[in-house]
Regions:
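Amphipathic alpha-helical segments that line or abut small-molecule/effector binding pockets
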Residues: 42-65, 70, 74-78, 117, ...
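Alpha-helical structural segments
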Residues: 3, 10-54, 58, 89, ...
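Feature detects amphipathic, helix-rich regulatory segments
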Residues: 2, 8, 13-17, 61, ...
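Hydrophobic/aromatic-rich alpha-helical bundle segments in the mid-to-C-terminal region
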Residues: 88-92, 96, 105-154, 165
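Amphipathic alpha-helical packing segments from all-alpha helical-bundle domains
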Residues: 50, 64-110
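Alpha-helix C-capping/helix-to-loop hinge sites
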Residues: 58-63, 83, 109, 130, ...
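Short amphipathic alpha-helical interaction/hinge segments
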Residues: 23-27, 67, 84, 127-138, ...
Length: 166
């Protein structure tokens, strides 16, 4: 490996660059808006709910079933406490980053930033937990079904709340 790279940092930089490319390709594949965080909520208001649903499932499958991202996720999980850079990457890719992303999406639907954050936690928390459940499960199909049910139920509750507000 070191014949092709000058050291660990160059290897990590290449891995992160590949992950960024994969993220961009998936966002484009699912036609998700590419905007700055302040524009997320407005951009997502025009995206069909089924598209957000499909993208969320694709994200989960990306982090669990695709070999490169799944190994990257597991590596970050193990190394997050040993190396500050790995901890930062873990937070950006798997913890705080996705929660902030979802909170930005929910800001226009919520009465406050705090409520948007609660929606984001309610949406992403089970998905985050299911990464670990999936890794250890002998019946991974059931885990995917649980995630599917969670996302559909969350969307139904969000839509019902939106109708009540009108």
């Amino acid at each position: 490996l070191y014949k092709h790279f000058s050291g660990k940092q160059e290897i990590l930089d290449c891995i992160v660059a590949q992950m960024e490319r994969m993220d961009l390709e998936r966002a484009q594949e699912y036609e998700m808006p590419e905007t700055e965080p302040d524009g997320f909520a407005e951009a997502y208001q025009h995206i069909p709910v089924e598209q957000i649903y499909a993208y969320s499932l694709a994200q989960f499958r990306h982090w669990t079933e695709e070999e490169f991202p799944a190994r990257f996720r597991r590596m970050l999980t193990l190394e997050q406490y040993r190396d500050p850079e790995m901890g930062r990457l873990y937070r950006d890719y798997l913890a705080g980053g996705p929660v902030e992303y979802m909170a930005a999406i929910f800001r226009r639907m919520a009465d406050s930033d705090a409520q948007a954050m609660q929606l984001a936690l309610r949406f992403y928390g089970p998905m985050f937990l299911l990464y670990s459940v999936y890794d250890e499960s002998e019946d991974r199909k059931t885990v995917i079904e649980a995630l599917d049910t969670h996302i559909r139920t969350f969307i139904e509750q969000l839509e019902a709340e939106k109708r009540r507000r009108k």
